[in-house]
């Protein structure tokens, strides 16, 4: 058995196309599948998203591939770090997760404020990052676009009508 895969099947030579008995088109994930993908990608990320917020994300990621959804979740997971990179003052608080101390951002006039950038904190594991929240996702969603273009989808549909079978 020979299995082949391509994201541009319409560019293949006719002889190669005819070599394969079955040509299957696996379409982009629908809303329920996108929701499951988001939930799966969130499983190791500390977050505050509700089921309704995850549903909102699933509904607003039409035309996103599985890879696009993975990138969206990973990008949103970095938002708290991006926020912390802008702070100029941190203070120590009693530690969690086995750390003697944790560092959190603060204002210059806060008691215990130490002038330093996040990159200057002695032990990066002692930085207490906030949980990823819905605002982080909304911000990320604003700048993230699906990688699949409308013309590509049209080409897939034409190829599937002529040669293959669609799997949803």
Predicted regions and their residues:
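Conserved AAA+ ATPase "sensor/coupling" helix adjacent to the nucleotide-binding pocket
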Residues: 36-48, 56, 60, 75-83
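Conserved nucleotide-binding/hydrolysis micro-motifs of P-loop NTPases
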Residues: 7-11, 28-33, 42-45, 63, ...
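Conserved AAA+ ATPase core "coupling" helix
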Residues: 1, 13-43, 52-56, 71
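Generic alpha-helical segment signature
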Residues: 5, 31, 47-50, 130
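Non-catalytic, surface-exposed connector residues within folded enzymatic/regulatory domains
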Residues: 14, 48-51, 131, 150
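C-terminal engagement/docking regions of AAA+ P-loop ATPases
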Residues: 1-3, 10, 59, 64-70, ...
